[in-house]
Amino acid sequence: MASKVLKGIRAIAFDLDGTLVDSAGGLADALDQALLAKGLPAAGKERVAAWVGNGADIMVERALTWARTKLTAQLHKETRELFDRFYETTVTTGSQLFPEVKVTLAELAKHNLPMGIITNKPTPFIAPLLASLDISEYFSLVLGGDDVKEKKPHPAPIYLTMGTFGLRKEELLFVGDSRNDILAAQAAGCPCVGLTYGYNYGESIALSNPDCILTNFSDLLSTIGLPSLKLQEA
C-alpha cells in the first residue's frame, strides 16, 4: 500500500520503459543483433537493462564502449541504424506489461484522469509498442525522444505536458523508475512517484528522493486517494 497520499492530482504522466513496460528483452535482442553484425560481442539482457533510460543513441554508445572497440561517429551511426532495423521487430516481440499495469490504467481512466507518456524512446517505436500491448487508448498525449529538443532529465517534456493539459505544476504527477525521471519531475516542480522495479542503472530509486516510492504499480491508486484494487475486490 502507498504510505503517502498526494492530493490535488488532475493528470498523470508516465515513463514507458521500466515503468509500464518490461522492454529489456526486445532492446537487448535488437542491440545484440546489431553488435554481432558489426563483429562485436553480444551484451545480453542484464547489461542492456542497465543502459536503458537515456535514449537509443546513448544506449548504443554504452554498448560500443563496453565492447572496447574504437568508438567513431561512423561506427555509432551504422550500429544505431542496425539497431533500429532489428528493433522494428523486437520492440513488440520482446516487450510485456509489468504486473497490474493494464488494470490500474483502466481504473484511472474510469476516474477521467488525463494520462500521458513521456519517454526518451525513439518516437517511431512507441505507437506500435502501445498498440501491441493494447494500452494506446489510455493516453491522450505521448511524447517520445524525437518530439522534444531536450530529453529527460531535462524538464522540457514535462513542461510541455503541463501546458498541453492546462495544469499547474502541482497538479501533474509523474511516475517513473529511474533517476532521470525523478530529476526531470523535480526540475519541473511537479510531484513524482518512483517505482522500485525497472531500469535504474543498478541503484535504488530511493537515492533520487521521489515524493513516493512504490513497489506495486496498482498502489498508485491509493497514492492519489482512489480506492485500491484490493479494496474493490473485497
From Swiss-Prot:
InterPro entries: HAD-like_hydrolase_sf (IPR050155), HAD-like_sf (IPR036412), HAD-SF_hydro_IA (IPR006439), HAD_2 (IPR041492), HAD_sf (IPR023214), PGP-like_dom2 (IPR023198), PGPase_prok (IPR037512). GO terms for molecular function: metal ion binding; phosphoglycolate phosphatase activity. Keywords: Carbohydrate metabolism, Chloride, Hydrolase, Magnesium, Metal-binding. Specifically catalyzes the dephosphorylation of 2-phosphoglycolate. Is involved in the dissimilation of the intracellular 2-phosphoglycolate formed during the DNA repair of 3'-phosphoglycolate ends, a major class of DNA lesions induced by oxidative stress. Its EC number is 3.1.3.18. This is Phosphoglycolate phosphatase. The keyword Transmembrane does not apply. Pathway: Organic acid metabolism; glycolate biosynthesis; glycolate from 2-phosphoglycolate: step 1/1. Its cofactor is Mg(2+); chloride. The lineage of its organism: Bacteria, Pseudomonadati, Pseudomonadota, Gammaproteobacteria, Enterobacterales. The active site is at 15 (nucleophile). HAMAP family: GPH_hydrolase_bact. Pfam families: HAD_2. Monomer. NCBIfam families: HAD-SF-IA-v1, HAD-SF-IA-v3, PGP_bact, PRK13222.1-2, PRK13222.1-4. CDD domains: HAD_PGPase. One of its GO terms (cellular component) is cytosol. It catalyses: 2-phosphoglycolate + H2O = glycolate + phosphate. Mg(2+) binds at residues 15, 17, 177. GO terms for biological process: carbohydrate metabolic process; DNA repair; glycolate biosynthetic process. Belongs to the HAD-like hydrolase superfamily. CbbY/CbbZ/Gph/YieH family.
